[in-house]
Amino acid sequence: FKIADETVKLMQKMTACGELDHLTAERVWLETQKGLNTPSPHIYFEVLRKVGALAVLFPEVEALFGKPQPEKYHPEIDSGVHTLMVLAQAKKLAKQAENPTALLFSSLCHDLGKGLTQEDILPHHYGHEVKGIQPTRNLANRLKVPSEVKDFAILVTEYHTHCHKIAELRPETV
């Protein structure tokens, strides 16, 4: 999959001229839903970033790029790169999901709290799960994401790190 250079330049020009500001939330969500349900959903967001549209349409996601994470847990280091890697992995599980779109959107949103991390504590992101609830809610509300998808994304954002300790929990806790 490759976008012609002329098309990329046109998309960059459209972004720079403010044409994206005239898109309705419903249209952005419709196209995003299509992008999420392609064989490689991360490419949709990579292209948006390449043409400058990610910062306009998904500023919460754009804020993740350039935010380092501890290499011990995330060898890719960059939080934005990590998010797109998670999205690519989630796609492999999406066929088994009751709501594939909810799974994929949640994967995109799961670390939005890292975009709010203060520079002086990087590469750590203490409390990013709870800090990520509001950006996830804001993004979902702005795009008029269906409630079922939004609610699942908020839960995933808040609780996604709990799975790392599941082996330590009592069965009744789980």
Name every feature range the model reports, one short phrase each.
Residues 1-104, 108, 112-127, 131-150, ...:
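Glycine- and charge-enriched loop/helix tracts that form the active or gating conduit
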Residues 146-174:
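Long, amphipathic alpha-helical stalk/connector segments used for oligomerization, subunit docking
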